[in-house]
Amino acid sequence: MRLEQIDHVALHCASPEETMAWYVSTLGFEHVFQDKWSGVPIFLRLGSTFLALFPGTKDAGSSKGGGFSHLALRAASYPDFQSAQTELQTRGISFEFQDHEVSHSIYFRDPDGLQLEITTYDL
């Protein structure tokens, strides 16, 4: 078996429409496949990765001790990483910086409380 990349991440959201608006306006995702599946799920794209937004709660999936940890997005460059921090501050979104030695990351939450990371290996 040969796999290439993650195709999409599916999220359960209290309000998929509000979550979509946040990902589009805050992180630059694009709303795609708008005329498919009666709008469920809402599909967003960033580069070659998709998010599928389903109605429901954070606990909608059944789990045996596992669960969603976070979604990491890679900045194109260190200046883009710095720009992301400025953009989040401008929008009043708090974040936490971490130096992982091989990368730098910032962590913050989306409107449904899911943890997001923006990272760069361009040190």
Tell where the protein language model's regions lie, with residue ranges.
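Short glycine-enriched loop/turn motifs at secondary-structure junctions
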Residues: 3-5, 64-68, 99-100
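N-terminal beta-strand motif that seeds the catalytic metal site of vicinal oxygen chelate
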Residues: 1-18, 71-73
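Acetyl-CoA-dependent GNAT
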Residues: 54-58, 120-123
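Vicinal oxygen chelate
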Residues: 1-2, 85-123
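Short, charged/polar surface micro-motifs in flexible loops or helix N-caps
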Residues: 47-51, 58, 78-81
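Core segments of cupin and vicinal oxygen chelate
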Residues: 12-51
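Short beta-strand micro-motifs in enzyme catalytic cores
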Residues: 40-42, 69, 104-106
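Short, conserved charged micro-motifs
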Residues: 18-20, 78-83
